[in-house]
């Protein structure tokens, strides 16, 4: 039994084929080098071979610096068969090699000139002559993919099964490079399809590994018919190779019953074809093998104590494959290999955090232990999956496992455990995790310095700091001056000892900001990159502050037109981010990160949590970034890799907040608000004050299904249409029942535009008036749904019946007449105010 932790990712045959590939690449390079002739020399040679007089006067001892004789040059520079005959009659030997090791016949074959090939052979050239690498002219034809040249050589007696220095026949080479026509020619002349190369590899092995389906069919169906169960020196059959490299069409073809392929055969490492498909995340191939051949391979363990399920967990990047395997009756999520390790151990060891979370959510037991098979039988070194993750420095997984930990009476205790009976583990970062983090961050900074355009490089001495205007976990934000501009300076604290370091966040934000250029996105001025202690991001200063401050701290009252201008600007900024060549997902869109100019226009800011959508860092799209209160359900639940549609959800909450002047779910803490939206499908109430065209946009925007949400291009179009018809967008015109006139509502509010409680009083009056005017509509609606309401209820009684606070901590009145809110309470009897 082998040690799982020492399982090689490459086999011996892989290493050999790598060297073979390199050797053929060198051969092609040397052939091409022989064709490289200086321009002036080439023109002179073209003149020689184009004029009988010039040809007759040339010296037979002529040589280029690469050792090409006139006979070689005749094959390269446009000579003809008469030149070949004349030169050979004058005594030039066709066997003479260039400095790169090739005779004239090899060059004629590489140039694909059947006429010159025939002339050379008729004039005495040896068809079996070997050049560099043990290659004959037929090998060269197979490498270059020239079927006519190959046929001429074979007609003149070339050995179809001749082997080169690595024991490859021309058929091996044609199968390796995918030259279908050359393969057909070789088979027509009787090539042996079952001859073995240096490591026992046959043409069918090579074509199966490379995915050349038509060549596989030729080898199996024509000529002497290839052995579909032939094994190489490591006992691989063709099915192993096509399963490993994901060639589904070849797998399906080989599994045909009439071919009698053995689907459960193992190699010297104990791997079945299903193992190799799972080790490489080839879901469709694995599915085909299981569905066609049954479950026998599912229970087989290789020498590293891994079943196919373990193998899929080792790969770890295809959760659909893992789900499929778990759906099979023969697979148990907690199955332990001979050394005791489970699929969860494998996922932890290789750092697949998304898969680890999936396995834990589906019943994987993190307390099962594995034993080190390299230890003597008298010693025990039991290790949980947490220890495996800690050993490899996967600190994020260690933290996740601690969160899921279920205490038991006895847990293994070793160097990774704290003394004591609780089995608690040492805190992260692990030693290796710390080294990984520091190394990665240094590399990220160096790469950023190299890639950031010089105009964005700033020195800290260029920046003049004024007052503090904000702060966060990263550090502080200052107002200041840089290059004669008033700017905002985001000063980072360097901290390399946390799983989500400030250095990493800084590098990501700068790499995104430097690529943005749009009037609705905050403008990037530059960054200080010299030293982590001086890291700073400089952007334009937006004097109006944040939308959150405007609505909830200053308690400013905006008319509908002003609100729509802000909404359109933010939507345009987000549309720009999502439509870039490399789309950017903001991941933290909320009213804090919407900044306002003095003229009422808005920009999107703060890209500390943003990511390029094509990022390969697999855990980027599974963490919970940003503010929970504005977070999309799929982000909060971490159940899937979310997309740009998560930004649409956050935007919809911001739009509702802008229109109502309320914080979403102000009566709940942020985590409770996110949980209600994710698990109970609760949404903020869409009251009478929100025009119908916008309310329909809100409902689509915070759809629980991301695919049901609109693109920002559609949002911009709808809101611009509303803005053009703002007079018709008032609450009065969007509801057919009794309503406020546009002037009576807005004039009342604007006339009480003083600071403090006058705003709150105005809002209270507004909602009370809306309640009174809309009572008849509510009574009619309640009767239609079977609810008998008392038309004489007071506003206070209505508030009590809906369990909704009249005034929140910011002094805002929640809309008691929201039909959506009332309906959601009736549909969900378990909903409780968790304030």
Swiss-Prot record:
GO BP annotations listed: bundle of His cell to Purkinje myocyte communication; regulation of cardiac conduction; regulation of cardiac muscle contraction; regulation of heart rate; regulation of transcription by RNA polymerase II
Localization: Nucleus; Cytoplasm
Co-factor(s): Mg(2+)
ANK repeat residue numbers: 66-96, 100-129, 133-162, 166-195, 199-228, 234-263, 269-298, 304-335, 339-368, 381-410
Sections of the chain in a coiled coil: 21-50
UniProt domain Protein kinase: residue ranges: 463-723
GO molecular function, one term: metal ion binding
Post-translational modification: Autophosphorylated.
Positions annotated to bind ATP: 469-477, 490
Family: Belongs to the protein kinase superfamily. TKL Ser/Thr protein kinase family. MAP kinase kinase kinase subfamily.
Assembly and binders: Interacts with TNNI3, ACTC, ACTA1, MYBPC3, AIP, FABP3 and HADHB.
Stated role: May play a role in cardiac physiology.
Protein name: Serine/threonine-protein kinase TNNI3K
Chain's gene name: Tnni3k
């Amino acid at each position: 039994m082998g040690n799982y932790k020492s399982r090689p990712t490459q086999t011996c045959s892989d290493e050999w084929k790598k060297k073979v590939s390199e050797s053929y690449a060198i051969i092609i390079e040397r052939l091409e080098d022989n064709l490289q002739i200086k321009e002036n020399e080439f023109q002179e040679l073209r003149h020689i071979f184009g004029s009988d007089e010039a040809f007759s006067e040339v010296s037979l001892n002529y040589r280029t610096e690469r050792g090409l004789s006139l006979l070689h040059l005749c094959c390269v520079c446009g000579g003809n068969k008469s030149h070949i005959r004349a030169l050979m009659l004058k005594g030039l030997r066709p066997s003479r090699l260039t400095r790169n090791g090739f005779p004239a016949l090899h060059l004629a074959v590489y140039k694909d000139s059947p006429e010159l090939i025939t002339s050379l052979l008729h004039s005495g050239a040896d068809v079996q002559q070997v050049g560099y690498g043990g290659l004959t002219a037929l090998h060269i034809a197979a490498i270059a993919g020239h079927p006519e040249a190959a046929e001429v050589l074979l007609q003149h007696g070339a050995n179809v099964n001749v082997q080169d220095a690595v024991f490859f026949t021309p058929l091996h080479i044609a199968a390796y490079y995918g030259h279908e026509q050359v393969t057909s020619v070789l088979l027509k002349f009787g090539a042996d399809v079952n001859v073995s190369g240096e490591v026992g590899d046959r043409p069918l092995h090579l074509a199966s590994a490379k995915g050349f389906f038509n060549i596989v069919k030729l080898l199996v169906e024509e000529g002497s018919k290839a052995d579909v169960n032939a094994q190489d020196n490591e006992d691989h059959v063709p099915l192993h190779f096509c399963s490993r490299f994901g060639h589904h069409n070849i797998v399906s073809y080989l599994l045909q019953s009439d071919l009698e392929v053995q689907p459960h055969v193992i190699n010297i490492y104990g791997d079945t074809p299903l193992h190799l498909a799972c080790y490489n995340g080839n879901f469709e191939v694995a599915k085909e093998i299981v569905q066609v051949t049954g479950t026998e391979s599912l229970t087989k363990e290789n020498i590293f104590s891994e079943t196919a399920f373990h193998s899929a967990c080792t790969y770890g990047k295809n959760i659909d494959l893992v789900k499929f395997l778990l759906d099979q009756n023969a697979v148990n999520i907690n199955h332990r290999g001979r050394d005791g390790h489970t699929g969860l151990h494998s996922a932890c060891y290789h750092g697949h955090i998304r898969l680890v979370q999936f396995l834990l959510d589906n019943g994987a037991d993190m307390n099962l232990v594995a034993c080190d098979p390299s230890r003597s039988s008298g010693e025990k070194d039991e290790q949980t999956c947490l220890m495996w993750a800690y050993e490899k420095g996967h600190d994020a997984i260690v933290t996740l496992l601690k969160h899921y930990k279920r205490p038991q009476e006895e847990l293994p205790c070793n160097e990774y455990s704290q003394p004591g009976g609780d089995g608690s583990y040492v805190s992260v970062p692990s030693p290796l995790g710390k080294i990984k983090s520091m190394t990665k961050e240094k590399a990220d900074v160096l790469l950023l310095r190299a890639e950031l355009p010089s105009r964005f490089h700033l020195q800290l001495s260029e920046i003049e700091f004024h007052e503090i205007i904000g702060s966060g976990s990263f550090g502080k934000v200052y107002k200041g001056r840089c290059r004669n501009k008033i700017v905002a300076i985001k000063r980072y604290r360097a901290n390399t000892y946390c799983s989500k370091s400030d250095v990493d966040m800084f590098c990501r934000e700068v790499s995104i900001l430097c690529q943005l250029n749009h009037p609705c996105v905050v403008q990037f001025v530059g960054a200080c990159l010299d030293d982590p202690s001086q890291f700073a991001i400089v952007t334009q200063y937006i004097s109006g502050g944040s939308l959150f401050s405007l609505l909830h701290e200053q308690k400013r009252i905006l008319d509908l037109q002003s609100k729509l201008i802000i909404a359109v600007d933010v939507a345009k900024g987000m549309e720009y981010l999502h439509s870039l060549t490399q789309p950017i997902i903001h991941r933290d869109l909320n009213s804090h990160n919407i900044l306002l100019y003095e003229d009422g226009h808005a920009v999107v800011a703060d890209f500390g949590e943003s990511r390029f959508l094509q990022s390969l860092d697999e855990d980027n799209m599974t963490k919970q970034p940003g503010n929970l209160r504005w977070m999309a359900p799929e982000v909060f639940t971490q159940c899937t890799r979310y997309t740009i549609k998560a930004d649409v959800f956050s935007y919809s909450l911001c739009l509702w907040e802008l229109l109502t002047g309320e914080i979403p779910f102000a009566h709940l803490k942020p985590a409770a608000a996110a949980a209600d939206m994710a698990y109970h499908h609760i949404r903020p109430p869409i009251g009478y004050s929100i025009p119908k065209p916008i309310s329909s946009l809100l409902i689509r925007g915070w759809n629980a299904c991301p695919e049901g949400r609109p693109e920002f291009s559609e949002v911009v179009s709808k809101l611009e249409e509303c803005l053009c018809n703002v007079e018709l967008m008032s609450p009065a015109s969007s509801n057919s029942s009794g309503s406020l006139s546009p002037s009576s509502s807005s004039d009342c509010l604007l006339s009480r535009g003083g600071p403090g409680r006058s705003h709150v009083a105005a809002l209270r009056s507004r909602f009370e008036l809306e309640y009174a005017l809309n009572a008849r509509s509510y009574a009619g609606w309640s009767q239609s749904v079977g609810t008998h309401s008392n038309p004489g209820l007071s506003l206070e009684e209505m508030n009590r019946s809906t369990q909704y606070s009249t005034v929140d901590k910011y002094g805002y009145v929640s809309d008691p007449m929201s039909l959506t809110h009332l309906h959601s309470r009736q549909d969900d009897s378990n909903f409780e105010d968790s304030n």
